[in-house]
Amino acid sequence: EFIARTKAAGAKGIRFYGICCSGLAAMYRYGGVIPLSNAVSAELVLATGALDLWVADVQDVFPAIMDVADCFKTTVVTTSESARLPGAIRCEYDHHHANIGETQALARRIVNMGIEAFTRRRGIPVHIPPYEIEAEVGFSLEYIAKRFGSIAPVAQALKDGRILGIVNMVGCSNTRVVYEQPTQVVTDILIKNNVLVLSNGCASFPLMKLGYCSRDAFTKAGDTLAQFLKPDLPPVWHVGECIDNARSSTIFGALAKYFGQDLKDMPFAFASPEWGNEKGINAALGFRLMGINSYHCVEAPIFGSKNVIEFLKHGTKELLGSSMNVNVSPEELANLIISDLKAKRVALGWAPTHAEAQA
């Protein structure tokens, strides 16, 4: 029905693109949704002039969205009562989702508005950067078991040092640092030192864009990690959207169980180089509660109390077995992570590196 209506309007069809975690969630659940960017560059995506309709839920509702959309006659629709934009069309659930039964009607209305916007926007200049890349996504404990037959091959590579350690690289982007640079730099140093990286949410976008999630990206990794990944596994395993941190924790948990060890004793780490909001603190604390250290290039936005920041940074070491580590230098932060992973290996009685294990 809608495809026919679209073609009658002169278009070839309907394409869906995604920003941030809403886009990743749709891609993972339905397919056919192409991820474009994380939240911070939302306006840049709009400024291509390529989008007929922009629909937002509770994220990416930035004030400048309407200014950019007006320049390109893009229709903006908000679907959350608590996240509206002046001038946007409201097509939303109420606060209690009492009208959840109207979902199909709301969706049909939005698609029709997109078709109308296409007709209205004829002649609008479009500039799409001439760059695209393929990324391998969908890693999970279940996929690992399917790919390798069990968790054992990954566990053995971890123990013998081919994989030095595993880091969950996540978090939002932050305008207080060079956009996406800390995430990319830390990741690059880690994989060159044979650390396997898991990623999801906003932090995964620069890693996808720069090829770290591509099947031939094992060439970016250190020798022993590349040996493990060949011929077609990337050094960064994409596990989903922001809330899919849970997939990383299940992978960590399965490996710890394989060795009969507590999570806090395993060579694992949580890195969120660019975090910049409350949910980032909560995500880090989720892993800290499991005894896994967190690492950041930006201080947590909790400076209302010196006692609170000192407790969250260092006071949790005895209580949880983990600490918060901050260094504004991505290079130094990456090296600290590597050093701490090696210390965990030594405490387990494992060689710090594969070369030392072979000696």
Spans of features found by a protein language model:
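Anaerobic metallocofactor- and corrinoid-dependent redox/one-carbon enzyme cores
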Residues: 1-359
